[in-house]
Amino acid sequence: MKYILILLYVFTSVVTAQPNIIYINADDLGVMDVGFNNSKYHTPNIDRLRNEGMSFTNAYASASNCAPSRACVFSGQYSPRHGVYTVGTSARGQVKDRKLIPIKNTVHLPLEIETLSEVLQAGGYRTIHLGKWHLGMDPTEQGFDVNIGGYNLGGPKGGYYLPIQGQAKVAEFNDDYPVGTHIADVFADQAVRFIRSHREEPFFVHMAYYLIHTPFQAVPEMVDKYGGHRNRWAIYASMVEKMDESIGKILSELDAQGLCDDTLVLFCSDNGAHSDISSQAPHRSGKGSYFEGGIREPLVVRWPGRVAAGATCDVPVMGIDFFPTFIDAAGIAAPKGKILDGLSLLPLLSQSGTIEERSLFWHFPVYLQAYAGKADDSHDPLFRTRPGSALRQGKWKFHEYFEEGRLELYDLEADPGERKNLASLYPQKTTELHQLMQTWRSELQAPIPTELNPKFKSAEN
């Protein structure tokens, strides 16, 4: 806490006005799914943010699927503190394939946990949520003045074009826009209206796109350039471009209102992509996996005059850092007694210093089944991941799986695809990181599944 307070003093002595903050969170967008990392994608507006701001080349989601990643951002805490480990039940996959009884999942972020949006709201910000919430029934219960399209479910199951059926918080705009309007355009229009209405006061815009989550639905005017409607990747790429186009409308409004210099824009994703559709090579696997492809993210921050254009940072960072970063930029102290596991990134953004050296941790004491019939290079044919923990320290990535007590050690510099397990070759480093993991779990009281599942059927049986 002392570290954060010192940063507040130094930074607010230079910047007196609270900046506007726009947090753009893509859904299921992999690190290799943006133009500045992969020229196959057309993302000129995301690329603009990268060219006008700082790109983090070792950025991580705090979890490998939707709800827990978002819970970590808005709580500023690792998963064991809030208990959101997955989406829905923790007992995913066939019961006969699960050796352990998984830890019970907390489906929604508990209301008693003070959120990022609540702290900004109390600090004088006008706040709006647009798009995917997934942390409860109504974002206005957790710090937002306005909610556009956010509720407890993960995506518009019937498609992205109006009229939306059966999902009230999205369908409420069916009568306000022409039939066939894409909901990304609805959200962009609503964000623009909010910015215009509150340009004279600090605002926090949480633009949480449902894109690129399922259902995969081609954008007709964009899909042909990527290979047409029969190509699954082309459909995916057209959705990425549609999101980018929507982002461009928000950036254009900042230009028109003369607000660019007064606005911190952060772009990221909640977890990795569906790797059977969009390869994250050289990283292994994708959404739902704790291999790099499931948790590596594109992260860009633009703040003209405070963040150098075209800058790059290779310090490992993760989603839990957004809470302390945003309140630090706003000159708002962390609430008394509030535990923040992340660090403010302002020293990195301003290139005026660094942050304390640390390890990054993940804890997943539940099961997440593999996508049926799809080879996505994840944990095994049955599960994207099984109960376990992971950490990154420097170049090292360490995994522990609870079913068999298996330990895995990878050198990310030499082996970014996590193919060669070095645990037996480096027993001292493996023991060191295992002990570090155990200490971290003890400090956070992270639950570990130990009860055997009586319905488990091993391969031998």
What spans do the regions from the language model cover?
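Catalytic Cys-His active-site segments of thiol-dependent hydrolases/isopeptidases
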Residues: 411
